[in-house]
Amino acid sequence: MSGIIATYLIHDDSHNLEKKAEQIALGLTIGSWTHLPHLLQEQLKQHKGNVIHVEELAAHEHTNSYLRKKVKRGIIKIEYPLLNFSPDLPAILTTTFGKLSLDGEVKLIDLTFSDELKKQFPGPKFGIDGIRNLLQVHDRPLLMSIFKGMIGRNIGYLKTQLRDQAIGGVDIVKDDEILFENALTPLTKRIVSGKEVLQSVYETYGHKTLYAVNLTGRTFDLKENAKRAVQAGADILLFNVFSYGLDVLQSLAEDDEIPLPIMAHPAVSGAYSASKLYGVSSPLLLGKLLRYAGADFSLFPSPYGSVALEKEEALAISKYLTEGDSFFKKSFSVPSAGIHPGFVPFIVRDFGKDVVINAGGGIHGHPNGAQGGGKAFRAAIDATLQNKPLHEVDDINLHSALQIWGNPSHEVKL
């Protein structure tokens, strides 16, 4: 294979999956085939999309009821020649799913890149090992928290929140994705003030915390803004990838003047991936493509919290982020939304040690504040790695957290 293989889930009301697959393969490449003269067929053969797999799936009555028609469900795979497109994500996505995304009940499930094509993408600049080296933490999941309620607040409020989270043992603190450039907490001021706080905490408590600052602005201003962040001493860039595009992420990741890890936020991605019938699968969008384009971290809904993703999908995202690939470093999985200490054993059981445990309200809502919330999570992480039930841990902060949010992991065995 020298190009790319696209895998689709289709729902076809003509009940002829083979014919539908061939129509897609031709429609997204040379347009027609059977009526072409033999000489022209020979000329265009190398550009023709080729159907390589058609598999009928069992009927799904709920889908038929929802669509108000009977359809035949199936998985099809089509190979697209590299000759047809330039080696970039805009060209790849337009070739494999451009006008097809408007054509009925079709979902792009996966893209399989040839080795030749993989070479055109940067992958994570730091990856899991690089992030762990920055923090000098190699033996446990990382703990991340989020600034909460920052809109309309000043730098003093930010510094207080940051200090409390760092003292609580949090490894990474990230901006809220809805915190943009503003007069009260402008980008460079957040970075400089944050560095002062984190250095003070490190000198006093010996715990290192990194700050992920939200990179925002107009598309053509992003690189300049990122370079200002670098000059100010930023640790990590948080980036709302799907508000801008995967190619913009790649452009940032490839720039040697922006030598920072990039944390990809999933904002807006639900518009592409939420439907079971249309769009792009979450594992492809939030897993494989983010990793290829250069994300060191990928945030996505966990299977447990307030915006839950189906467990199978969440694990598939993580698989794409962390599976062995000689072309790319591994990216950190960050299952998120509604996470509290009682979920820690689930997260470690399902995602392993190479995961970032991300909490907002589960830290800030603790009765002992963000310091207590962070310490509760750290106690839960330590206990889980020792295979010790959380309710047996003699830690006042963890005990308080379990009283508030419960202990759904009571019977979890690692």
Curated annotation (Swiss-Prot):
GO terms for molecular function: 2,3-diketo-5-methylthiopentyl-1-phosphate enolase activity; magnesium ion binding; ribulose-bisphosphate carboxylase activity. CDD domains: RLP_DK-MTP-1-P-enolase (cd08209). GO terms for biological process: carbon fixation; L-methionine salvage from methylthioadenosine. Its EC number is 5.3.2.5. Keywords: Amino-acid biosynthesis, Isomerase, Magnesium, Metal-binding, Methionine biosynthesis. NCBIfam families: PRK09549.1, salvage_mtnW. HAMAP family: Salvage_MtnW. This is 2,3-diketo-5-methylthiopentyl-1-phosphate enolase. The lineage of its organism: Bacteria, Bacillati, Bacillota, Bacilli, Bacillales.
